[in-house]
Amino acid sequence: MRLLLFNLATDVNDPVLAFALAWVRRLAPHCEYIDIITMYRGDADLPANVTVYSAGRERGLSKPRRVANFYRHLLRLMATRRYDACFAHMMPLFAGMAGPLLSARGIRTVLWYTHRQRSRQLRLGMAMSWRVVSADATSFPYETDKLRVIGHGIDTDFYAPAAPADWGDTLVVQVGRLAAIKHQATTIQAVAGTAGELALIGGAQAGSASGYEEMLKERAGQVGMNQRCRFTGDLPAAAVRDWYRRATVAVNMSPVGLFDKAALESMACGVPTIVCNPAFAPLLGERADLLLTAGPDDVAGLRDRLERLFALPPEERAAIGRRLRNGVLREHSLDGLSERLLAVLRTGELPESPHSRRSMST
């Protein structure tokens, strides 16, 4: 396959988007070449058959200059290369901008989008795409016959269990940007009613409303968590993984519509993970009562589940973690995602295999 790929950032140091480099590395052996047009180019160790072209955000270029650079790269590549497909990763903007040119050449676009946010930009990108792929049926905000559900792609070799550090039995970890939609305030209040310590991993998103981090710190003080709550800021992936490995319990309060890969990363590390999004229920199995709360504001329910998990013998918590990891391996591994994505790029449909997730597609 000869693949054109659009993404928002190609940078191993990006705290949110660096994971997508693992997708590129896994796709590369199946492709003659991959050409990436990205909004932001940073450091990236990629295979020899992958070439990156940037619109120039890393150089501080204005929007009009970035638009001009995008079309300059696209037109030159279309004049000198042949493509079998285009994959737009969280880039409905580029999918929409390139759509007429690609369609005229018979190049079909597959758009990956996993967020509940609706926008005119997304509608245009969807209109210009042959297929849309998302992690879960609930993680794409529009109903469309174009949607194919392919799961997340978690690097389960990287996110894997290790012998835990001696942090006792009450360390709670929540990973995600500091934002109201992630409901860190719920976790702070819930942990405050237990003997646990809390680590909030992640910083405020650039351009987000100011003051949320300060509000969280104030809330921690109000409930007596000043000495038991750490704010680490943004960390590289290896450091995030190390926090997962130290954790007794991981928490993810992302609501319906946000099928958050951070919850899958902690599960892949073998950590009992409490969630509030029922889309995760198939992974929780018989322990759903212990790992699924009523919603992102359910402080009492989260506190109850934390206390019950803290009270379990370490061996039982480890057994829960193993079952969660096995579910991620089965449904959301990088190999499985690569197989499903390549099938959609080639045929528009999921593969006929145990990895197909056909029961969740629309």
What are these regions (language model features)?
Residues 44-46, 199-227, 238-239, 243:
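Short, structured helix-loop element that forms part of the nucleotide-activated donor/catalytic region
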Residues 4, 165-182, 187-201:
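Conserved donor-binding/catalytic core segment of Leloir-type glycosyltransferases
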Residues 272-276:
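Short hydrophobic beta-strand element within catalytic cores of glycosyltransferases
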Residues 255:
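Aromatic "clamp/platform" in nucleotide-sugar-dependent glycosyltransferases that forms part
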Residues 162, 311-346, 352:
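A charged, aromatic-enriched C-terminal amphipathic alpha-helix characteristic of glycosyltransferases
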Residues 287-300, 307-314:
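Conserved acidic donor-binding segment of nucleotide-sugar-dependent glycosyltransferases
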Residues 18-25, 179-193, 211-214:
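A conserved mid-protein helix/loop that constitutes part of the nucleotide-sugar donor-binding site
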Residues 234, 242-247:
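Short alpha-helical donor nucleotide-sugar binding micro-motif in glycosyltransferases
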